[in-house]
Amino acid sequence: MSEIGLVKIYSGKVRDLYEIDDKRMLMVASDRLSAFDVILDDPIPSKGEILTQISNFWFKKLAHIMPNHFTGQTVYDVLPENEAKVLEKRAVVAKKLTPVKVEAIVRGYLAGSGWKDYQKTGSVCGIRLPEGMQEAQQLPEVIFTPSTKAAVGDHDENISFEECGRIIGKELAEEVRAKAVRLYTEAAEYAKSRGIIICDTKFEFGLDTNGTLTLMDEVLTPDSSRFWPADQYEVGTNPPSFDKQFVRDWLEQSGWNKKAPAPKVPADVIQKTVEKYREALTLLTQD
């Protein structure tokens, strides 16, 4: 991605942040793909643009629930035209916020690490579930399963709600849980009407200068969520998905030890992943 005339202040698994001033930053979504907390060598073409469009759609759709990082400005307000033109579809002028130090994970269905946990313990992240549940089954109620926020290259660790309260304070933990569950519930209902089941998702929150909880980073994208096609959903299976699960499944079968460097992902797997991302965008946002 081309360099721009702003100072880079952070480079994450997928996003790069650039300083505009003490209140604003430019958030740029790259085409990088991370799986199992490792950044893969092979980018997914146009992925950053698709993620930005999906995120922006949800930020607007869910704005009645809570404030978000939008400033109301575009890249053309902060960059020269030649730079703005290159980045306009993958960059957002965002408020600078103090990140809440936990990942807010919400699950509506039993899958992934939650399914593995349930098979071993009958619980997901310490939350007891009914006996005899199957893979991909809808949970009796939506559950909040926070995790630590690891540095790039480290693994996030699931924690209990009590531990979450110890890290960020009980009152803030309760607010994060309530907002995350409401965001997921409303989004899942809408997505289902468009043919997508949102199995689970991860929200990121920050605090503004007044201490107001604010939704930030990315929202309900194929990178932060597990999206399933509703017409292929079947309890007791690992449903196909619209997200990077396609790459994750390929990596799982490759015999890779999940430590950097990752193996080279075949071109057809990359192409199918691009198609999945684009299909999710179309289903969610088309009129």
Swiss-Prot record:
The name this protein goes by in its record? Phosphoribosylaminoimidazole-succinocarboxamide synthase
Instruction: Please give one Pfam family short name.
Output: SAICAR_synt
Q: Which family does it belong to?
A: Belongs to the SAICAR synthetase family.
**Gene Ontology BP terms:** 'de novo' IMP biosynthetic process
What EC number(s) would the UniProt record show? 6.3.2.6
Q: Which reaction does it catalyse?
A: 5-amino-1-(5-phospho-D-ribosyl)imidazole-4-carboxylate + L-aspartate + ATP = (2S)-2-[5-amino-1-(5-phospho-beta-D-ribosyl)imidazole-4-carboxamido]succinate + ADP + phosphate + 2 H(+)
Look up and give the organism this protein is from.
Neisseria meningitidis serogroup A / serotype 4A (strain DSM 15465 / Z2491)
**Pathway(s) annotated for this protein in UniProt:** Purine metabolism; IMP biosynthesis via de novo pathway; 5-amino-1-(5-phospho-D-ribosyl)imidazole-4-carboxamide from 5-amino-1-(5-phospho-D-ribosyl)imidazole-4-carboxylate: step 1/2
* Sorted UniProt keywords: ATP-binding, Ligase, Nucleotide-binding, Purine biosynthesis
Which domain of life does the protein's organism represent? Answer: Bacteria
